[in-house]
């Protein structure tokens, strides 16, 4: 019975997300809302079995996709993946919590605080909470992200649109 509960919680950690308002804030929500006690059991997830959701549904098949890997039930710290079917400029935004990016596939460009840098596979960066930043992600990129609190996106000038697709670095 405990194994079944652990598996249910582990699978449920591929949480859904909700778009609040007019897409100005994106928030990850934990899947375990059943009132069951949280667990510290190990969790394993194969990329091939990941559940992906569109971040910007208005962009249709061109939308970047998100896979919430795990949300800590106590702190709401979140581990997630983002992949991009098309190159996209992710407009200026900020997060309530500290955020890290590790590039798995592709070479992304990040800008913040008057600086811009390209990061390739294996590269890492840290964005302090509420630091306004933007990114240019290539087609078919994959980025691993951790957030030390609940994951959200607060757009400075609105979310990306079709005009931001395939925008050059």
Where are these regions (language model features)?
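Bacterial N-terminal signal peptides
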Residues: 8-16
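Glycine- and acidic-residue-biased ligand/ion/polar-headgroup-sensing regions
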Residues: 85-88, 95-113
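Conserved short histidine dyad/triad with adjacent acidic residue
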Residues: 70, 75-95, 128-132
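A short, N-terminal "cap"/entry segment at the start of jelly-roll beta-barrel domains
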Residues: 23-78, 160-169
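Short acidic-glycine-tyrosine-enriched beta hairpin
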Residues: 74, 112-132
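Extracellular/periplasmic catalytic domains that process cell-envelope and extracellular macromolecules
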Residues: 60-62, 73-75, 94-96, 118, ...
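Double-stranded beta-helix
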Residues: 41-46, 134-169
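Bacterial N-terminal signal peptides that target proteins for export
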Residues: 1-7
């Amino acid at each position: 019975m405990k194994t079944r509960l652990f598996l249910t919680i582990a699978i449920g950690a591929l949480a859904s997300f909700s778009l609040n308002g007019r897409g100005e804030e994106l928030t990850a929500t934990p899947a375990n809302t059943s009132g069951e006690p949280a667990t510290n059991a190990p969790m394993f997830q194969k990329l091939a079995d990941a559940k992906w959701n569109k971040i910007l549904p208005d962009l249709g098949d061109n939308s970047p996709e998100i896979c919430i890997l795990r949300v800590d039930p106590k702190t709401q710290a979140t581990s997630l993946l983002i992949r991009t079917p098309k190159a996209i400029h992710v407009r200026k935004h900020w997060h309530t919590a500290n955020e890290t990016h590790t590039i798995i596939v592709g070479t992304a460009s990040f800008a913040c605080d008057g600086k811009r840098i390209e990061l390739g596979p294996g590269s890492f960066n840290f964005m302090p909470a509420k630091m306004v930043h933007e990114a240019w992600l290539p087609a078919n990129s994959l980025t691993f992200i951790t957030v030390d609190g609940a994951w959200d996106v607060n757009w400075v000038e609105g979310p990306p649109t079709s005009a931001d697709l395939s925008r050059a670095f």
